[in-house]
From Swiss-Prot:
Part of the MsrPQ system that repairs oxidized periplasmic proteins containing methionine sulfoxide residues (Met-O), using respiratory chain electrons. Thus protects these proteins from oxidative-stress damage caused by reactive species of oxygen and chlorine generated by the host defense mechanisms. MsrPQ is essential for the maintenance of envelope integrity under bleach stress, rescuing a wide series of structurally unrelated periplasmic proteins from methionine oxidation. One of its GO terms (molecular function) is metal ion binding. Its EC number is 1.8.5.-. Belongs to the MsrP family. SUPFAM superfamilies: Oxidoreductase molybdopterin-binding domain. This is Protein-methionine-sulfoxide reductase catalytic subunit MsrP.
Length: 318
């Protein structure tokens, strides 16, 4: 798995400090409100520590936590980057249910607690590349989607895995007001091939920076597919359906000439309105500290995922 040098991204010192404290105290999924140790105060339900297996040690240097939680695309809460943190602050994620259905032998439902204790949680530090040509490095906490797929026991007809975001216009103003929500036909829907879903890199995340996901980042559970553009990593999932046929996903329906089904990070295939050859790195600096770097094929995960697309024309199947 590709790693960063210490000069690639602004370090997140606070994350390492907090994780050491949490681990030393032996605290797990129970509620934990940390005292003021140098990071911004947040709602107590966002400070619940998660019990997880650390990512392998290395020179991973992370995007500052306040940028990860304050610079978001989540159109259900508005199209401005700051809107999700502002309008999702009272979003209720407990109780919650995640339904597994479709072409499976073992359909089931997970409640809120089961999202955190059904599968062993682990930390994954991944590059995150938005289709808008900006990037972050984020320490997710979650479990491989493959574990859930194996529990569901898909039938031989299951070729695609379809994900559905919660539809709740009373809580999600972007669903209530189409202008506020970017003109999207909600609920938001995304999908992967069954092979993509089973790849070890594909993660269902329930946390970041050692804590439960905040609402603006897709609480309580979201998809993370690090070799694809960020819009594939659907948030606040309530249903996963196994299907024989490929659906038309949300952005594919809205603008098919701009957003394809596969959405693999590819510096050789530009968006119709901008280049994808490089990306703006979201770091600790302001506008005067903008850093750009070359975009890597499959976002740097080519060795792990290129075989999934053997024989596929990635310029046509973008």
């Amino acid at each position: 798995m590709n790693r960063f040098t210490r000069y690639d991204v602004t370090p997140e010192v606070i994350f390492n400090q907090r994780r050491q404290i949490i681990k030393a105290m032996g605290l797990g999924a129970a509620a934990l409100s940390l005292p003021n140790i140098g990071f911004a105060a947040e709602k107590s339900d966002q400070l619940k520590a998660l019990n997880f297996k650390d990512a392998p040690k290395g020179d991973f240097l992370l995007t500052p936590e306040n940028k990860v939680t304050g610079y978001n695309n989540f159109y259900e809460f508005g199209v401005d980057k700051a809107s999700p943190a502002k309008f999702a602050k009272d979003f209720k994620t407990d109780p919650w249910s995640l339904e597994i259905a479709g072409e499976v032998e073992n359909p089931f439902v997970l409640n809120h607690a089961q999202l955190f204790n059904t599968f062993p949680l682990e930390e994954r530090i991944y590059r995150f590349r938005c289709v808008e040509a900006w990037s972050m490095v984020i320490p997710w906490v979650g479990f491989e989607l493959a574990r859930l797929v194996e529990m569901a026991k898909p039938t031989s007809k299951a070729k695609f895995v379809i994900f559905h975001t919660l539809h709740d216009p009373e809580q999600m103003p972007g669903q209530k007001n189409k202008f506020f929500g970017g003109g999207i036909d909600y609920p938001y829907v995304e999908a992967l091939t069954i092979e993509e879903a089973m790849n070890p890199l594909t993660l269902l995340s329930v946390g970041l920076y050692g804590k439960m996901l905040p609402p603006q980042n897709g609480a309580p559970i979201r998809l993370v597919v690090p070799w694809k553009y960020g819009f594939k990593s659907i948030k606040s999932i309530v249903k996963i359906t196994f299907s024989e046929t490929r659906p038309r996903t949300t952005w594919e329906k809205l603008a098919p000439h701009e957003y394809g089904f596969y959405a693999n990070v590819n510096p050789n295939v530009d968006h119709p309105r901008w280049s994808q050859a490089s990306e703006r790195v979201i770091g600790s600096g302001g506008l005067l500290a903008v850093k750009r770097q070359d975009t890597l094929m499959f976002n740097g995960y080519e060795k792990e995922v290129a075989h999934l697309y053997k024989g596929l024309d990635l310029k046509v199947n973008f």
